[in-house]
Amino acid sequence: MKIDESLVKRLETLSMVEIEDKASMAKDLAEIVEFVEMLNELDTSNVDATFSTLDNSTYLREDEPIKNNVIEEILEHAPKAKDGFFIVPKIIE
């Protein structure tokens, strides 16, 4: 793919972003495309499409509801609390 200033102008129009230095942008985009083309040359024939480094090592637990009193424990440390809520000073009149 050839990256030149006319392509940069088209991208500028499509993205609705003003590009001041079109020549520099064309050079940068050409380098990016060249890098991606290098990646396309990699031999991935021996790599499974579903390859993962995790090997299902994520521990899954049973999702069981547990009754606890976390709210009460937290509110015990609050300066003021009532009916399960923090009581704070009024700051807006």
UniProtKB/Swiss-Prot annotation:
Keywords: ATP-binding, Ligase, Nucleotide-binding, Protein biosynthesis
GO BP: glutaminyl-tRNAGln biosynthesis via transamidation; regulation of translational fidelity; translation
Pfam family, one: GatC
Origin: domain of life: Bacteria
Enzymatic reactions: L-glutamyl-tRNA(Gln) + L-glutamine + ATP + H2O = L-glutaminyl-tRNA(Gln) + L-glutamate + ADP + phosphate + H(+); L-aspartyl-tRNA(Asn) + L-glutamine + ATP + H2O = L-asparaginyl-tRNA(Asn) + L-glutamate + ADP + phosphate + 2 H(+)
UniProt function note: Allows the formation of correctly charged Asn-tRNA(Asn) or Gln-tRNA(Gln) through the transamidation of misacylated Asp-tRNA(Asn) or Glu-tRNA(Gln) in organisms which lack either or both of asparaginyl-tRNA or glutaminyl-tRNA synthetases. The reaction takes place in the presence of glutamine and ATP through an activated phospho-Asp-tRNA(Asn) or phospho-Glu-tRNA(Gln).
Name used for this protein in its record: Aspartyl/glutamyl-tRNA(Asn/Gln) amidotransferase subunit C
Organism encoding this protein: Nautilia profundicola (strain ATCC BAA-1463 / DSM 18972 / AmH)
Upper lineage: Bacteria, Pseudomonadati, Campylobacterota, Epsilonproteobacteria, Nautiliales
